Amino acid sequence: CSGLSTCALMKLSQDLHRFNSYPRTNVGAGTP
């Protein structure tokens, strides 16, 4: 990671994608 902010953002993004994987919200499942 080049910067802490970038690292945190990337981790957050991964977590968000993980949550989107679950059939919790149709909106999340619709977006790649």
Curated annotation (Swiss-Prot):
Entry keyword DNA-binding: no
GO molecular function: hormone activity
Cystine crosslinks: 1-7
Proline amide modified-residue sites: 32
Domain of life where this protein originates: Eukaryota
Keyword annotations from UniProtKB, A to Z: Amidation, Disulfide bond, Hormone, Secreted
Main localization, broad class: secreted
Keyword Ion transport: no
GO annotation, cellular component aspect: extracellular region
Function: Causes a rapid but short-lived drop in the level of calcium and phosphate in blood by promoting the incorporation of those ions in the bones.
Family the entry assigns: Belongs to the calcitonin family.
Protein name, as recorded: Calcitonin
